[in-house]
């Protein structure tokens, strides 16, 4: 986290409290990680004295994080990435259920970004999108990559006539397989080509579209975050298997 510019570091207690309260209000998922594991959680409550974080879904992970000497927490919203570290967590209760309780961090990184890290969408089963062009024709595409800020898409046919950069689309339907179907507004940022060399040493060219999401609701944003976390975890697991 020290790789960020110091301008993104918040040390004022009121500023830190404000960021954490926004994460709590919008129920933004937290990725809690330590030397030997990670899980997804959320903030249950926060005040000037303490931060209360929900238990994870697996008991062994909850036990493991309590033994960790330092815990890193990352949250991503549509507008920024938040990162901070905490000392050893302590278990307690919130509304009669187990929870982690800790003092607020002494500092946190609040990094506003124009571009988001994009994670590759699965090749199988593929994720698909459908929207309507201004002339009422249907535009279908396959998701190539995904972030909170937008998505990359590949067309299975030629670029339709009249499709231009800057065009806006309302209620684009995204079929995310096991995650379900989502609807988002999006703007077409760029039209390009993806070129790959196949097994016959021939170049395969596929039209590629880059979209920016518009007016994403907090509920959809939370689900997108969960999908991205899951895809990141699967990518790491595949990489580990290759190394083994």
UniProtKB/Swiss-Prot annotation:
Q: What is the effect of changing residue 118 to D?
A: Suppresses a yhjH disruption mutant upon overexpression, binds FliM but no longer affects motility in this assay
InterPro entries, alphabetically? PilZ_domain, Split_barrel_FMN-bd, T3SS_YcgR, T3SS_YcgR_PilZN
Cellular component annotations (GO), alphabetically ordered? bacterial-type flagellum basal body
Effect on the protein of changing residue 223 to W: No localization with flagellar basal body, thus no binding to FliM
Q: Which UniProt keywords apply?
A: Bacterial flagellum, c-di-GMP, Nucleotide-binding
Biological process annotations from GO: bacterial-type flagellum-dependent cell motility; regulation of bacterial-type flagellum-dependent cell motility by regulation of motor speed
Q: Which residues form the PilZ domain?
A: 112-230
Q: Name one Pfam family in it.
A: PilZ
Where is it mostly found? other
Q: Where are the transmembrane segments?
A: none
The effect of disrupting this gene, in the record's words, is: No visible motility phenotype. Disruption of this gene suppresses the reduced motility of a yhjH disruption, thus the double knockout is motile. Overexpression of this gene in a yhjH disruption has the converse effect, i.e. it reduces motility further.
Subcellular locations according to the entry: Bacterial flagellum basal body
Any one GO molecular function term: cyclic-di-GMP binding
Q: What does this protein do?
A: Acts as a flagellar brake, regulating swimming and swarming in a bis-(3'-5') cyclic diguanylic acid (c-di-GMP)-dependent manner. Overexpression of this gene decreases swimming and swarming motility; those cells that are motile turn predominantly counterclockwise. Binds 1 c-di-GMP dimer per subunit.
Belongs to which family? Belongs to the YcgR family.
Q: What is known of its domains?
A: The N-terminal domain is involved in FliG binding, the C-terminal domain is involved in FliM binding.
Quaternary state and interactors = Monomer. Interacts with the flagellar basal bodies.
This protein is called: Flagellar brake protein YcgR
Q: What is the scientific name of the source organism?
A: Salmonella typhimurium (strain LT2 / SGSC1412 / ATCC 700720)
The opening ranks of the lineage are: Bacteria, Pseudomonadati, Pseudomonadota, Gammaproteobacteria, Enterobacterales
């Amino acid at each position: 986290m020290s790789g960020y510019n110091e301008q993104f570091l918040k040390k004022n207690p009121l500023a830190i409290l404000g960021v954490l309260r926004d994460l709590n209000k919008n129920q933004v998922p937290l990725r809690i990680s330590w030397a030997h594991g990670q899980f997804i959680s959320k903030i249950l409550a926060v005040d000037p004295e303490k931060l209360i974080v929900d238990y994870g879904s697996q008991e062994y992970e909850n036990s493991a994080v309590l033994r960790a000497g330092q815990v890193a927490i990352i949250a991503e919203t549509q507008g920024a990435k938040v990162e901070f570290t905490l000392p050893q967590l302590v278990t307690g209760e919130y509304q009669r259920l187990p929870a982690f309780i800790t003092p607020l961090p002494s500092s946190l990184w609040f990094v506003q970004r124009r571009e988001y890290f994009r994670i590759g969408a699965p090749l199988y089963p593929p994720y698909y999108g459908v929207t309507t062009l201004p002339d009422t024709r249907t535009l279908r595409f396959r998701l190539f990559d995904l972030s909170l800020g937008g998505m990359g898409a590949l067309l299975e046919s030629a670029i339709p006539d009249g499709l231009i950069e800057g065009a806006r689309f309302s209620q684009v339907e995204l079929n995310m397989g096991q995650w379900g179907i989502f609807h988002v507004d999006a703007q077409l940022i760029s039209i390009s080509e993806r070129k790959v060399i196949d097994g016959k040493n021939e170049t395969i060219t596929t039209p590629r579209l880059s979209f920016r999401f518009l007016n994403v609701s907090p509920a959809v944003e939370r689900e997108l975050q969960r999908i991205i976390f899951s895809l990141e975890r699967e990518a790491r697991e595949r990489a580990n298997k290759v190394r083994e």
